[in-house]
């Protein structure tokens, strides 16, 4: 959900670290020749290896195996954007596709005089007078279609092709997402007020920063915009670098941060209902995503899973994920800069977003 705290305010190349190379001399003592006289034949020291030496060898072997596993990527390097491989024609096509999609979305769904969304929201609202219940129903409908179609992706792509399936997926998911976002914007202050913390000094700045950070987790799909728009053939990716080193499910983490920030700021029952719906959907999405990746990538996914975590930084802290020295470079890439620009742009565009939502009267 792309709204932020400012809704309520007045101002609104794959990295392969070199493998650890063990020393050529193993920690065993060389056999020593005992002193002897001409009358005594030489004899070798047959003292057994000490437990200390054996332990060192075992530790060395385990360390080597762990280092090799952590330094050999089986997934893809995320957020790579090579200008030399970009085609101007592809981005012109992307712009044209985006324009057509937005036009059709407006005429067929959003516009109250021609679209279907108003009738859809009215039908859902007729089920309950509670904005919280309507909010949860809208989330449930979106989640069923979005996650359901994601689960059917492999079969659907085999049946009609990757691009055609992406068009159908987006054609259903996008209108439902827009409807849910607009309903939240229009009714976010219609619930029962549970707490009021907006007057606490510094809380707005803290929550705004939290919301800003959440977008770096929320939108990893910006790494492949041409695939999102089906300009390039859509693929299932097994990412392993960048934000994935911190958490295997960045969208879940970003959504939790976003929900907590907005719920703390708004402080009412509608915000709580929206957060319950969003977080529940993303928890299921994390489980379902792991299941689908395990089916598609098999052992490669299991390797990535072993050295990543869902909880941010957990795999790093317990040593399963070893960050390369230049880890920060995985974030100094165009897609992350694009996320920064779009997030700031959305912040300053909030008055326009609110006005557009209010005019729909959903």
Which residues are covered by each model-predicted region?
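Cytosolic, membrane-interface loops and tails of multi-pass inner-membrane proteins
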Residues: 52-54, 58-74, 152-160, 229-237, ...
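N-terminal membrane topogenic signal
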Residues: 80-96, 126-134, 331-335
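Hydrophobic transmembrane alpha-helices
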Residues: 5-14, 50-53, 93, 99-107, ...
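N-terminal chloroplast transit peptides
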Residues: 1-66
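Membrane-interface helix termini and inter-helical loops of multi-pass transporters
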Residues: 113-125, 153-156, 187-200, 229-233, ...
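Portal/gating segments that form or line small-molecule/metal binding sites
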Residues: 177-242
